[in-house]
């Protein structure tokens, strides 16, 4: 699909300041900035091409600019990270620990499948949600990622694979809807600057009150994935502490509103935990919540981690859960995580370097 413009996510009318990282800026912003520096407007498009398509990491390396001007802006950061560590799984999945300018480490994952290359990106350093089954939340929360730090993850994976990224999922470290401004800016840049179609971008959230409704107002064509993980409020509170302040019925009401406004189907993520939320009666209860609006359920068999005692259900238990949903006419599939040897699968995005 072509890169449909995110018309509701327009670039800032204010030009980039000279000392701000340039990655994430639109061609309009870059043009304004180069003109501030006394350069002709066409240099903005050239700069845009070098940043997003030629992988330049320093303005001093842009050969089409004069040596004098390159020297004058040598200290202006583009905003690229460095690869701190790289792990490769037998299925070709690659996990990256990326070091940011302040020394913090975030994780990104490159997932090759056939002719596609999907990147799983982080939106925060750590995560404040502290979901009971998730490795990332066990490490605490540091800060939000800036827009350039989000876009950089995609460019880094693309350059390392030497293959064009086709899809991006915001399912790494952090809760995207607690960093809405930078996430929306990152979505805009990935769509309009990097050239990835909106429908190839997936935004995942555990559910933050009112944020899904606010997202709907942008009328985006991105895919929204909601981490549900339980069929009722009591069990969801056990697994997701933040659910105590956001009832499952309120969350689902926002989801229905989102579908009505955008016309886009919602994906519901459901991690299967042995003996916890994987019984046939859980599947039946879940199905009752999902009738009457467009949705799809991704069942994710759990990936065990050292810090918690949850286990993956047996194949028979997974199939039984799947069958109940299918019998209730719920669109459903099982998603088996990639990159287990690299600790890169869903729920295992954790920085070993911080241990």
From Swiss-Prot:
The keyword Lyase does not apply. Belongs to the radical SAM superfamily. RlmN family. Keywords: 4Fe-4S, Cytoplasm, Disulfide bond, Iron, Iron-sulfur, Metal-binding, Methyltransferase, rRNA processing, S-adenosyl-L-methionine, Transferase, tRNA processing. NCBIfam families: rRNA_mod_RlmN. Its cofactor is [4Fe-4S] cluster. This is Probable dual-specificity RNA methyltransferase RlmN. Residues 1-20 are annotated as: Disordered. Gene3D superfamilies: 1.10.150.530, Aldolase class I. The active site is at residues 107, 346. Specifically methylates position 2 of adenine 2503 in 23S rRNA and position 2 of adenine 37 in tRNAs. S-adenosyl-L-methionine binds at residues 174-175, 204, 227-229, 303. Disulfide bonds join 120-346. PANTHER family: 23S RRNA METHYLTRANSFERASE, RADICAL SAM CORE DOMAIN-CONTAINING PROTEIN. SUPFAM superfamilies: Radical SAM enzymes. Binds 1 [4Fe-4S] cluster. The cluster is coordinated with 3 cysteines and an exchangeable S-adenosyl-L-methionine. One of its GO terms (cellular component) is cytoplasm. InterPro entries: Aldolase_TIM, Methyltransferase_A, RlmN_N, RNA_MTrfase_RlmN, rRNA_lsu_MTrfase_RlmN/Cfr, rSAM.
